């Protein structure tokens, strides 16, 4: 592009073509883009457990305005009453840690009244990421070497903006078993 108008046209064409993959220009980081998407679309995010909180809190606490869209555990897993209610819901779940985590994500989202609830299940080689909404949950398994926190932030950004999730991220309706292939680490 040789002129400002041509550059603008090329930028718009790229943004239209790769809307879900592009999250910002210049110095914008993924965490800033996720917070901006939550704020722009008036969405509230909570974490259902301390593991997800650990992934997100350290990154989000440095972003201006994050407290408007993320509870930093205050209304969710760090609140003793909410934690007790979440544990009561999860203790009745059969089938192992994955269905239990899915139930915990759904319960946190409903108890707090948030738009999204994040959760994670750390395993030896990988981490299963959950991002729950009212009707279901996005699930993605990521190798620990692939920075699960950034994948979770990308899932949040895409969900808050109404964009399609990255390939390898599965939509899971509540009450249904998660397919085994969704619990295998995805590579790009």
Task: Please name every model-derived segment.
Residues 1-5:
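Helix N-cap motif at beta-to-alpha junctions
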Residues 6-188:
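Short alpha-helical segments enriched in small residues
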């Amino acid at each position: 592009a040789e002129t400002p108008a041509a550059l603008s046209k090329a930028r718009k064409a790229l943004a239209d073509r790769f809307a879900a993959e592009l999250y910002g220009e210049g110095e914008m980081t993924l965490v800033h883009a996720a917070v901006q998407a939550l704020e722009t679309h008036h969405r509230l995010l909570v974490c259902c457990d301390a593991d997800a909180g650990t992934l997100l809190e350290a990154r989000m606490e440095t972003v201006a305005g994050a407290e408007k869209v993320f509870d930093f555990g205050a209304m969710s897993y760090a609140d003793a009453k909410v934690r007790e209610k979440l544990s009561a819901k999860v203790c009745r779940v059969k089938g192992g840690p994955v269905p239990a985590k899915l139930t915990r994500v759904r319960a946190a989202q409903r108890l707090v009244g948030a738009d999204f609830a994040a959760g994670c299940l750390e395993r030896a080689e990988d981490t299963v990421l959950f991002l729950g909404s009212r009707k279901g949950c996005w699930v993605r398994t990521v190798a620990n070497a692939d920075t699960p926190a950034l994948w979770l932030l990308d899932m949040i950004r895409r969900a808050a903006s109404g964009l399609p999730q990255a390939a390898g991220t599965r939509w899971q309706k509540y009450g249904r078993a998660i397919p085994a292939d969704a619990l295998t680490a995805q590579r790009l």
